[in-house]
Amino acid sequence: MKKPVKYLCVAVFVPALLFAYVYSHDGARSAAGSDTLLLLLPDAVDSSTPAVREWLDAAGEEGLHLQPIHDSEFLNPLSSFHARGVILPDQLHRAANDVLIGELYRYVRNGGNLMVVYDACTWDLNGRFPPGDSRLSSLVGVRYALYDEYTTMTMEPAQVTGTSAAMREIGIPPGSFVPVDNDGNLDRWRQVAEREDADSRFAFATYQYGNVDYPLFRTLGDFDGTVLLRSKRWLAAGYRQEELGHVLFVNLPLGYLASRTDGLLLHSFLRFFAVHMLGLPYLVTVPDGIGGLVFNWHIDAHSSLRPLKILADEGVFDRGKFSVHFTAGPDVDEFGDHKGLDVLHDAETQKWIHYLLARGDTIGSHGGWIHNYFGSHLDDDDEGEFQKYLEMNKDALERVSGTRVTEYSAPVGNQPSWVTRWLERNGIVAYYFTGDAGLGPTRVYRDGKRDAPDIWAFPILHMGKDASLEEMGFDDVPISAVRDWQLAVTDFTVRQHAARLIYTHPYGAERLFGTLRTWLDYADALQKQGRFRWYTMTELAEFLTQRESVRWTVLQVAPGKVTLRATHPKTLAHETWAFPQESYGDARVVKGQATVRMQDGMIFVTAGEGRQLSVEFSARGDVDRSAPESTEAKR
């Protein structure tokens, strides 16, 4: 894909069921249950449009239940929805009438939970800002959408900061936020101290660019809740209590950013609202609920083989199974330069491919035959010219390796949408991606649509504006900072029970070998404790695709009793659910095979072989009473 850009501001009905909500990853309509979130949409918005699917996909990837509902259904006094919270999305729900605004106030004040995103309900039905400020200002706890006062400057791009505790709470990985001084200048990433100064601020950073400004509404007044993020002058995100209910206000265009390959904040706030604020269970994104990393190696020139040998001699490739990608042609910068690996004819390159396969690594395709030429010339409209290089690279690797190539990485990160579609048509299930940085495996949305229906993107982790070890070396990042970042992202995946991708080239790793060894030793220790794993892109992509066929239900079977019921057409093996211990306890397997463990404030239920599972829990206070409060609040 092209380099990331900074973003400037731009201006159901269902019968009431007593208990159950059956969740379907493909978005099939079903009755909402007590662990469900509702995405509130205007009647004119079709729930199958890409902008809506983007929200539903994000929730599904996070293992959450999110169901669209239209305004008329929400307002219908004969309707009843057993759901834990309502989300007002940006872009999709800018306009609202006073009746809906009043119902939202009643819903929250009677015990409902509401997430208000950016410009949701800031317009009247004529597409204009109402006089004064947003009609939801009193609900979210701060005045905003102040068009009468600021006109064309109602929204402004600004640097967004938070404390280290807030960044951790909303699930931002280390390196996607870095320290910032009082003048807004980004410092190098550093390990956060256990007792961080309350005044210390951390700002979001993007790969290659570093500093990024996000569009915000100017806000006025003191916020009486908990501030999560802010700019120098305005509230960016915070949550508060309003009578019996709670409101999370995110003054950032989450959907807009996600549609432009910056989906980290959308995913993070969905998870924060559902799990941290509401205590909802979720389907974990990694096998057995064990977090880990994909270590993606890019080998693109014959000069890579010398550092590759040094790393191999030091036992690096005996530490875990990695995703190792090769550019297969004989040239690198221009045709005839003979700097390439020449996979089809070079015996040394072939030896390394078989060496890595023997250690359990997955061999992938790194672009199209001639690394630098391909990466620098590839464009959105040149499929006819460059498709042959993708074919040649993939075919050469399959001939030499004797295995099917199922993963891909783009030279210099250049990933036009047509390449993604070609990859999916040709059996690739996963690809490295420089957009959506900081996320786990995801489906990419660009220009108002999803790139391809089934293939999984694996966004990179980065440390400020650097991602690969050689970039950190070129920028003279202190070795101690590189080491601390590697350890911190490993801890992040363990704590989040999630997977992320780190990438590098052999010559970058060779320069920082001492740091690399310390990191691998640390990962080894965590792996022996059963808390960490190395994954390949293909392995996770296949797991996540299988996970999409899981159907699961949360039933309140009696006061203080909740049952998880799950099915899969083939097997539930390795699927894992997380239930917050503050809300649930006393898990007991009633049907099927599963193991139960308590860890990091969660009850993890991991399914064994079998197509059906039933697990009973005791439900603590809020879970037992939240459904009637939240669903009947507006009545």
Give the positions of each predicted feature.
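Extracellular ligand-binding/catalytic regions of CAZymes and related secreted enzymes
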Residues: 23-33, 222-225, 233-235, 240-297, ...
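A glycine-rich, often tryptophan-bearing local segment used as a flexible ligand/cofactor-contacting loop or short
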Residues: 94-187
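Metal-dependent polysaccharide deacetylase catalytic core of the NodB/CE4 family, i.e.
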Residues: 122-123, 135, 143-161, 316-419, ...
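Catalytic beta-strand/loop cores that center a nucleophilic Ser/Cys/Thr
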Residues: 150-243
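Catalytic grooves of carbohydrate-active enzymes
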Residues: 292-300, 461-539
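Surface beta-strand/loop "capping" patches
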Residues: 538-582
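Helical hinge/lid and interdomain linker segments adjacent to catalytic or ligand-binding clefts
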Residues: 47-130, 324
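C-terminal beta-strand-rich structural cap/linker in extracellular carbohydrate-active enzymes
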Residues: 98, 599-634
